Amino acid sequence: MRAVFIQGAEEHPAAFCYQVNGSCPRTVHTLGIQLVIYLACAAGMLIIVLGNLFVAFAVSYFKALHTPTNFLLLSLALADMFLGLLVLPLSTIRSVESCWFFGDFLCRLHTYLDPLFCLTSIFHLCFISIDRHCAICDPLLYPSKFTVRVALRYILAGWGVPAAYTSLFLYTDVVETRLSQWLEEMPCVGSCQLLLNKFWGWLNFPLFFVPCLIMISLYVKIFVVATRQAQQITTLSKNLAGAAKHDRKAAKTLGIAVGIYLLCWLPFTIDTMVDSLLHFITPPLVFDIFIWFAYFNSACNPIIYVFSYQWFRKALKLTLSQKVFSPQTRTVDLYQE
């Protein structure tokens, strides 16, 4: 995999990004279409940044939210927020203008940060599924099994593995020496796109489907446990009935998360594998649509995992009412009905 950029090329005023042989053709949109696309992308980035920023703030500020599960949510929110802040602005301009105007250094940096934040988000979704599975299917041992230290290990793995993987395919000599074998297969030069040969294209497959299979299998088990509890709810005490209701809600939330995860990432992952075999035949517009579908998952995460919980609504209300500036607010029990 390699980010390709021709530095020092002059921009062609009509049909090409740069005045060199093999330069990317520039798609010229009308001003109205450009405005619509920019506004849509800006709205998406705003949701991603503000939604995840508030998740990070709420978990950090309110002491009642300092739990292993919420620390995973905090780390997930940071990954998605950084994606919206550092990656998507440049991706928006590249998608609308169909050209890269920011030089070789930013091309490399953007190419590194994009998969880093996306993979980190995917890994955290998988770890949150594991956490919810332990909490629902093994509630008695959960407090001792999933501690803050365990959560921090998951967070370290969730950032460390994607960082190592992304560094491997961008900055190792192995990739550089094999680049000449398939560099000519790239669609054009000067586009700052990730180019995947067959090996890297198919390596992306388990990075998507392994977390997906883990989440699906855990969801099925959680759903079975929650359904069994619902059938026995008439014989349960009030407290246990409340716990069963909470478990069913967790199962529903996880099911929605898995479904949206598949919807957002499946088109891009399949296209990446197929494209590496068929000499990069995917039109740039179609590729942009697929990758923005994947980006959209980062906007859904705070809605799926947090907006449906009462503690988040209470935290949001306290913040908007400016009561958050009171010293006593930090110790408020957000879980109290």
From Swiss-Prot:
Function noted in UniProt = Olfactory receptor specific for trimethylamine, a trace amine. Trimethylamine is a bacterial metabolite found in some animal odors. Trimethylamine-binding causes a conformation change that triggers signaling via G(s)-class of G alpha proteins (GNAL or GNAS).
Q: Which domain of life is it from?
A: Eukaryota
- MF (Gene Ontology): trace-amine receptor activity; trimethylamine receptor activity
Question: Which residues are reported to be glycosylated?
Answer: N21
PANTHER family named in the record: HISTAMINE RECEPTOR-RELATED G-PROTEIN COUPLED RECEPTOR, TRACE AMINE-ASSOCIATED RECEPTOR 5
Recorded source organism is Pan troglodytes (Chimpanzee)
Give a Gene Ontology cellular component term annotated to this protein.
plasma membrane
- What keyword terms does UniProt attach to this protein? Cell membrane, Disulfide bond, G-protein coupled receptor, Glycoprotein, Membrane, Receptor, Transducer, Transmembrane, Transmembrane helix
| Database matches in Gene3D superfamilies | Rhodopsin 7-helix transmembrane proteins
Region Extracellular Loop 2 (ECL2): list its residue ranges: 176-189
Q: Which SUPFAM superfamilies match?
A: Family A G protein-coupled receptor-like
The name under which this protein is listed is Trace amine-associated receptor 5
PROSITE patterns with a match to the protein in the record: G_PROTEIN_RECEP_F1_1, G_PROTEIN_RECEP_F1_2
Location(s) in or outside the cell: Cell membrane
Pfam families in the record, alphabetically?
A: 7tm_1 (PF00001)
Q: Which residues lie on this side of the membrane: Extracellular?
A: 1-34, 92-109, 176-204, 275-284
